[in-house]
Design a protein with these regions (language model features):
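Catalytic donor-sugar/metal-binding loop of nucleotide-sugar-dependent glycosyltransferases
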Residues: 210-227
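N-proximal low-complexity "stem/linker" segments adjacent to membrane-targeting elements
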Residues: 1-45
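A conserved acidic beta->alpha catalytic loop
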Residues: 63-72
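Conserved short acidic donor-positioning loop in nucleotide-sugar-dependent glycosyltransferases
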Residues: 47, 64-65, 92
Length: 418
């Protein structure tokens, strides 16, 4: 996040929405679930506890061909509560499950909720007030992770927080381009006009938001509502998630790059494209320089027959210093420059975040920020590089029930043999 963005956010205060809902609308909450036996119970308990008239609430769980006990657990709740409906279908992916649920819903308001995400009791009321106050068609919440025990989870905690603050700025430009899975609120009229979720798109939440933007629907980001979600707890799962997000952005950017919203087209898309170029490029430059300098250093050791005694004895000589300090030269300068920029950003970020989240101590926020500072450049560069590789050479990649085959090599082969 850039310095000018954070300076802008320093002046941001939570906006109190003084709006009374005179008549509560019928709300249908669609919960797509695939192998969510560990999470579905907690999610349903939280939905039952929502502060909303139960005669105006409809919870629809769509089991998307789970291989665990997700369906059985959900059915137990259906038997207890008349406002819960549970369906089971063949595995077809999240979009397919969402569409299945929406087509069987009756609410004038549709809420999508990932089965591993948890709303607060007042989340729905706040989101609806936000929707009516701003006359919005879609309202998107902030998202934060539940678990922060592992380093990989602490990294994601800060990453989500940064995205939340970015959302505030993007919202000011009327350029919200993701209707995230955890508790996005839609007017039914949106789906009636532009259709349901794209079942072939691996980033359906981005695609539906961009399609709504293209059709001039108003999307608002509601930072006052923070939905908790379960993050990937290992690097392999995180890599798979972020590669999917990156491929989804590339596909959706290609599809909607001519969108009329100039702020979205030129600024939001532009910044993302620049990052997708600079991050892997910087990473590869650093990797190359480290490799070259290490090679030169090992070459020097070889020239002295790996005589460690000679090396230690002459370790302060000019020649050896040249080899040693080359390891800390240009590549480290690039890294230090990035670190200084990020450090300034995080000092500002920490001061803002404490206004926003009182649950973490100053020490925790600083600790998490240091972890993010250390990993962010490398992680994001790796995510982008792997995604670009798949975009060029990937054949048939599967995410849930969706098979992604939108790579350059597949297009060339289809053109050649199609």
């Amino acid at each position: 996040m850039s310095i000018y963005t954070l300076l802008f956010l320093l002046s941001y205060d939570k906006e109190e929405i003084n709006y009374e809902i005179k008549e509560y609308p019928k709300v249908s909450i669609i919960v797509p679930a695939y192998n969510e036996g560990k999470n579905i119970k907690n999610t349903l308990e939280r939905l039952i506890d929502l502060e909303y008239p139960k005669d105006k609430l409809e919870i629809i769980v769509v089991d998307d061909g789970s291989k665990d006990n997700t369906y059985e657990i959900a059915k137990e709740y259906e038997e207890k509560y008349n406002f819960i409906k549970v369906y089971k279908k063949e595995n077809g992916g999240k979009s397919s499950a969402l569409n299945y649920g929406i087509s069987r819903s009756s609410g004038e308001i549709i809420v999508t909720l990932d089965a591993d995400s948890i709303p607060e009791k007042d989340s729905l009321i706040k989101m609806l007030k936000y929707m009516y106050y701003y006359n919005a068609d879609i309202v998107v919440p902030a998202i934060q992770t539940i678990n922060t025990k592992k380093l990989i989870e602490k990294y994601q905690y800060i990453d989500y927080a940064i995205h939340n603050f970015s959302g505030i700025v993007i919202d000011k430009m009327n350029s919200v381009f993701i209707a995230s899975g955890p508790f996005s609120v839609f007017k039914r009229s949106v789906f009636e006009k532009i259709g349901l979720f794209d079942e072939k798109n691996i980033s359906e939440d981005m695609e539906i938001a961009l399609r709504a933007q293209k059709n001039n629907f108003k999307i608002k980001f509601c930072p006052e509502v923070i939905i908790k979600t379960v993050p990937p707890d290992n690097f392999k799962s995180l890599l798979k998630q972020r590669v999917r997000w990156t491929l989804g952005f590339i596909d959706n950017y290609t599809k909607y790059r001519d969108i009329e919203n100039i702020y979205l087209r030129e600024i939001v898309f532009g910044i993302n494209i620049i990052l997708y170029v600079l991050l892997p490029l910087s990473f590869l430059i650093i990797l190359y320089m480290h490799g070259k300098q290490l090679y030169d250093f090992l070459k020097y050791l070889s020239s002295i027959n790996y005589d460690i005694y000679y090396f230690i004895k002459n370790s302060f000589s000019f020649d050896i210093n040249t080899y040693i300090f080359q390891l800390l030269s240009t590549s480290q300068l690039i890294l230090i420059t990035f670190s200084i920029i990020l450090l300034i950003n995080f000092l500002l970020f920490i001061s803002i975040y404490k206004r926003y989240d009182k649950s973490k101590s100053w020490l925790s926020i600083i600790y998490y920020s240091v972890i993010y500072l250390f990993f962010s450049i490398y992680f994001n560069a790796i995510f982008i590089i792997v995604a670009i590789y798949y975009k060029l050479f990937g054949r048939n990649l599967r995410w849930g029930g969706i098979v992604w085959n939108n790579s350059l090599i597949n297009k060339l082969l289809n053109r050649k043999y199609g």
